[in-house]
């Protein structure tokens, strides 16, 4: 049996795009996330309440990794001509017990390793794609790959929900 929350969050608004190289958007966003995460060592264990949710360092990094992975699989499926698999997990809406764990140097090191490797996958995959592929719209309801990448580059939102906790 599969169970999941049935919340939907499709506002139908396409993300803004600009002329930045899509291959650099995710690595730049990950660098910004990790810069903020570096200030979370010594977090006091209390969740930060922002934008209708409880946020912790672990939850923010979980959401960044989930978001990067979800959309990377979407892009890969589309480029392979395969149907995408809808995401029924609404991880932003829940805070797990694991999200309340202490945030240590080891956690930052793990996040750095994981997120920089995901960013490298985006850079490698997107770097050689022609504009025609990046801007193809399979149907009116589907975002272009360029729009997806610009959307994903906003993963800095999750780190911003925790914010900078100490001086770097």
What are these regions (language model features)?
Residues 1-168:
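Aromatic-glycine hotspot motif
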């Amino acid at each position: 049996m599969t169970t999941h929350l049935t919340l939907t969050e499709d506002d139908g608004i396409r993300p803004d795009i600009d002329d930045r190289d899509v291959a650099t958007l995710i690595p730049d966003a990950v660098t910004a996330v990790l810069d903020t995460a570096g200030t979370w060592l010594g977090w006091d264990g209390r969740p930060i309440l922002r934008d209708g949710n409880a946020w912790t360092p672990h939850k923010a990094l979980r959401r960044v990794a989930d978001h990067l992975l979800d959309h990377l699989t979407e892009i890969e499926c589309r480029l392979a001509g395969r149907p995408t698999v809808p995401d029924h997990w609404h991880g932003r809406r829940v805070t797990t017990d694991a999200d309340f764990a202490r945030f240590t140097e080891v956690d930052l090191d793990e996040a750095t390793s994981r997120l920089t490797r995901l960013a490298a996958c985006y850079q490698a995959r997107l770097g050689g794609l022609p504009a025609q592929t990046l801007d193809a719209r399979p149907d009116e309801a589907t975002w272009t790959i360029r729009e997806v990448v610009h959307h994903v580059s906003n993963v800095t939102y999750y780190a911003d929900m925790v914010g900078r906790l100490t001086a770097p």
